[in-house]
């Protein structure tokens, strides 16, 4: 499901140091700016490592009022690039082209509409 976005909440993630070192740590490329964690998960799975989420909720997280403004158009393009790399790594290249359009389309969405839709999505969880 990494083509649909990061499946892990990075703030609470635990990982083995040797795995992080084997992957070369976080990418410092400008193409992964603001999506470094997502890129790391893709590389981790592509290298054969696995992860999981506990079923128990251990903490709550919230976005502050500036969270949406930090989601720049460039960070959405970077997310699309990671999706395309994931598609290639996992053999779903044709599907990843469609998935990679979603972050870019969100970038064209008016802020008020994005806030509304984001709130609706979160209220379903």
Language-model segment annotations:
Residues 1-74:
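Conserved nucleotide-sugar donor-binding catalytic segment
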Residues 98-108:
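TPR/TPR-like alpha-solenoid helical repeat scaffolds
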Residues 38-41, 79, 83, 102:
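Hydrophobic alpha-helical core bundles mediating ligand binding, dimerization, or RNAP-core interactions
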Residues 94-96:
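Short, aromatic-rich membrane-interface segments at the entry and exit
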Residues 69-92:
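Catalytic core of nucleotide-sugar-dependent glycosyltransferases
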Residues 106-125:
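Terminal low-complexity segments of carbohydrate-biosynthetic enzymes
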Residues 16-17, 49-50, 82-86, 103-104:
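Secondary-structure boundary/capping motif
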């Amino acid at each position: 499901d990494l083509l649909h976005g990061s499946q892990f909440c990075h703030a609470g993630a635990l990982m083995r140091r040797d795995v992080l070192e084997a992957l070369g740590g976080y990418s410092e490329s400008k193409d992964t700016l603001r999506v470094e964690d997502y890129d790391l998960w893709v590389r981790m799975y592509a290298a054969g490592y696995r992860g999981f989420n506990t079923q128990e909720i251990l903490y709550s997280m919230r976005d502050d009022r500036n969270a949406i403004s930090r989601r720049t158009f460039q960070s959405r393009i970077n997310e699309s690039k990671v999706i395309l790399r994931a598609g290639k790594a996992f053999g779903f290249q044709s599907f990843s082209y469609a998935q990679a359009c979603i972050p870019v389309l969100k970038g064209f969405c008016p802020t008020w509409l994005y806030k509304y839709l984001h709130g609706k999505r979160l209220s379903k969880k």
